[in-house]
UniProtKB/Swiss-Prot annotation:
Alphabetized HAMAP family for the sequence: Trp_synth_alpha (MF_00131)
CDD domains assigned to the protein according to its UniProt record, in alphabetical order: Tryptophan_synthase_alpha (cd04724)
Subunit architecture: Tetramer of two alpha and two beta chains.
GO CC annotations on file: cytosol
Name under which the protein is recorded: Tryptophan synthase alpha chain
Pathway: Amino-acid biosynthesis; L-tryptophan biosynthesis; L-tryptophan from chorismate: step 5/5
Catalytic site: 47 (proton acceptor), 58 (proton acceptor)
Catalytic activity: (1S,2R)-1-C-(indol-3-yl)glycerol 3-phosphate + L-serine = D-glyceraldehyde 3-phosphate + L-tryptophan + H2O
Domain of life: Bacteria
Keyword Lyase: yes
Known EC number: 4.2.1.20
Gene Ontology MF term list: tryptophan synthase activity
Length: 258
């Protein structure tokens, strides 16, 4: 399915709620169970993090989750195996969030073959500059897996247009300067930034980094096509507050109907 499965998540004006889970945090059985739960709860896409020892874009919550996964001996191969098994039970799109180093260490051809086998539909590589994306972009295109671009508040318009014109899946619009993590509120300029990104791409635009309340979700999906919620989802899963994740999903769907 690949790119088409991601596109379907945004069809007919659907607003996407994209939770992030760290692969192997709590074990690989837990990863499969969390994917099943998020699918049943109505999430649009699930973003799965590949743990890495130097996660430069991650805030403290995601860093701790990655460290727990690495400390428990979780491997990239193990995560792929868990995704292969999860894919037999769910049709929700899988998007991997991985730094470039684990891809190259695993072998980029082998990594993408494993993605295909596991039914991965898209990949986000936060430390891969646009100018260097040919390291993996042609292989991903051949495999029908979306290389999802990140744009930031400081990205000039021309750069946004260039990055998004060659991309597939959706555009990940980073809503804060700095790392991921829970924020209390967003500055007014974020609204004009998201509108600017939307006006310069044919792809759905998803807001991410720092989204941690239902109010944030409601605010963001009035402007763009969906949200990624990472640190907050990890906290809620860790504290067994799953009903709050369902409330986030409901907040997204309500805006869809508005």
């Amino acid at each position: 399915m690949g790119v088409e499965r991601i596109q379907a998540a945004f069809e007919n004006g659907k607003k996407a709620f994209i939770p992030y889970v760290m692969g192997g945090d709590g074990g690989l059985e837990i990863l499969k169970e969390r994917i099943r739960f998020l699918d049943e709860a109505g999430a649009s896409i699930v973003e799965i993090g590949i743990p890495f020892s130097d996660p430069v874009a991650d805030g403290p919550t995601i860093q701790r989750a990655g460290k727990r996964a690495l400390d428990s001996g979780v491997t990239v191969k193990g995560i792929f195996q868990a995704l292969i098994e999860a894919r037999k039970e769910v049709q929700i799109p899988f998007v991997l969030m991985t730094y470039l180093n684990p891809v190259l260490a695993f072998g980029k051809e082998r990594f993408i073959e494993n993605c295909m086998e596991a039914g991965v539909d898209g990949i986000i590589v936060p430390d891969l500059p646009y100018e260097e994306q040919d390291i993996i972009a042609p292989l991903l295109r051949e495999a029908n897996i979306a290389l999802i671009p990140l744009v930031t508040v400081t990205s000039p318009i021309e750069r946004i247009k260039k990055i998004t014109s060659e991309s597939e899946g959706f555009v990940y619009a980073v809503t804060v300067a700095g790392v991921t993590g829970v924020r209390q509120n967003f500055k007014d300029e974020i609204h004009s930034y998201l509108e600017k990104v939307k006006s310069h791409t044919h792809l759905p635009v998803v807001a991410g980094f720092g989204i941690s309340t239902k109010e944030h979700v409601e605010e963001m999906v009035t402007i763009c096509d969906g949200v990624v919620v990472g640190s907050k989802v990890i906290e809620l899963l860790e504290n067994e507050k799953r009903e709050e994740i369902c409330e986030f999903i409901q907040a997204t769907k309500q805006k869809e109907e508005a």
